[in-house]
Amino acid sequence: GRCGRMWQKRGMMGSQSGRCAGPASRRAFLEVGSLALGGLTLPDLLSRRAAARETVGGAVDTSVILIWLQGGPSHMETYDMKPEAPVEYGGLLKPIHTSAPGMNICELLPLHARVAHRFNVIRSISHGFANHAGGAGRFLSGYNPLRPLDPKSQFPCLGPVVSKMLQGKRDLSMPNYVASATNVYGGGSAGLGPAYLPFVIGGDPNSPGFKVNNLSLAPAIRDRLDDRRLLLSGLDGLRRDVDNSRLMDSIDKFNQEAINLLTSDKARRAFDISQEHPRIREKYGRHRWGQRALLARRLVEAGTSFVTMQMQNPGISGGIGNWDIHAVNGHLYDDAKARLPVFDKAISALVDDIYQRGLDKKVMVIVAGEFGRTPRINPQKGTSSKVMQPGRDHYPGAMSVLVSGGGMETGQVIGETTAKGVRP
């Protein structure tokens, strides 16, 4: 069907079990939101966005949250458990039932299990690039990278495409594209240029003193914005001064956007995570990943079109720095036991919150990394531990992706892999 073909376009292989249901506007939203997943090109995206506007009365008020799991998570320890496979494939962790009939996931994701009826798991995605940059570039742009080892993609990835496409079409008080890092490894804006890179949120939003740094502005106005206390007390006057002096006409796009953001009450409120109710902050988890997920929700609710939040290092002890769980880097199960409960709380809260706040028709959540991990466990001596320990290596032949919201019919497992998780 139409959705099945979408997953196969431009070589990103996928198969679908179940059906693609829902009215045309929802289907159009899903196709737009799945640009990189399905390998859609920029013309594809523009035509589908136009079609989506027609079917929903001209609205473009849709957003995507991409939770990016840098390093490549193991599908076999998260969303595609193989308890019947030999232990050297299926591993030691066990599956649990969920609120979605027929969907089993890892025992270390019990909060996921409670909200599984609100997301889909796609188990049938694969590609051909087993290095981090190539895998990320392939997944995020929809194209085969020309230089797979280049840390920057040769083709524009989804966030910059959205930023370019929506330039001038949405409320200028919020940035179109926000990310927790300047760029994901293997991502980038490529030929679109630096104007469409994200508005970057650095730091840890869980820290008590967290705030978004000032933007870099042209010399003509920098002196008036260097002092944060002056900025907070004089934003209204700054806006009047800028408008009256026609200075806005003499500075470039970057600085116009900077002034719009710095003088926007909406932006300040959205970025100020300290204004969130403590109960909600606890629900997401008082750690780096949980508060990044919460901040992403605040931003799309305020009008940002595309948010990428990296969940690489959870900022806790017991695990490795990212999802790249080779045996030389760390112990497969020790890392899972440290990492997955943090991940579980953040993602389950985000999914639940999107629905509780009535955002599920306009916001799509995508949770993915650049590839899966080898189905067969590869024990090696750990660089730090100096002992033999289990791990899994890079594997683009099979991977799992979680998607939620976007007006989709949820609670589905889409596609499957072979008995040992080797391929779709």
PLM regions: where:
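Ligand-binding pockets and gating/stacking loops
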Residues: 3-424
